[in-house]
């Protein structure tokens, strides 16, 4: 049986790992074993954070909508409830964009939501108890 030499493949593999780990600090960019470990971790972090990014953006949009809604004297919860009752189908991404770029349009949406909201039965009445 012929002898198999793996030097070329091994060097190619090591070179590709070291090339991918170029921006890392210290030994992680120079030593193959450390670079390989770090590359495995980095790819796992990238995979995890691509999914986490979606939730982070949703949180950002909600906080922006809430801030703009409170500037118009309504809470985020009531705004979303009113928009749903009015049949306005605007997602949070676009709603946050409207809140920042076009405050007048956002105020119009708030008015639509207010009109569609049912009267709050738990709201304090004008009489003193």
Swiss-Prot record:
For this chain, one GO molecular function annotation is: structural constituent of ribosome
Q: Name one Pfam family in it.
A: Ribosomal_L20
Which biological processes are named by the entry's GO terms?
Answer: ribosomal large subunit assembly; translation
Query: What's the domain of life for this entry?
Result: Bacteria
Gene Ontology CC terms: ribonucleoprotein complex; ribosome
Alphabetized UniProt keyword annotations: Ribonucleoprotein, Ribosomal protein, RNA-binding, rRNA-binding
What's its job?
Binds directly to 23S ribosomal RNA and is necessary for the in vitro assembly process of the 50S ribosomal subunit. It is not involved in the protein synthesizing functions of that subunit.
The record's family statement is: Belongs to the bacterial ribosomal protein bL20 family.
Q: What is this protein called?
A: Large ribosomal subunit protein bL20
Traced from the root, the source organism's taxonomic lineage reads: Bacteria, Bacillati, Actinomycetota, Actinomycetes, Mycobacteriales
């Amino acid at each position: 049986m012929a002898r198999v030499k793996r030097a070329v493949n091994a060097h190619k593999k090591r070179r590709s790992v070291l090339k991918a780990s170029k921006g890392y600090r210290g030994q992680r960019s120079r030593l193959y074993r450390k670079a390989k470990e770090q590359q495995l971790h980095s790819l796992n972090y990238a995979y995890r954070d691509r999914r986490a990014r979606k939730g982070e953006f949703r949180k950002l949009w909600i906080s922006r909508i809430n801030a703009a809604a409170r500037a118009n004297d309504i809470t985020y919860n009531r705004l979303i409830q009113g928009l749903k009752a009015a049949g306005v189908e605007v997602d949070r991404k676009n709603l946050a964009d409207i809140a920042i770029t076009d405050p007048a349009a956002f105020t119009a949406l708030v008015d639509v939501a207010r009109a569609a909201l049912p009267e709050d039965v738990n709201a304090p009445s004008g009489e003193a108890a």
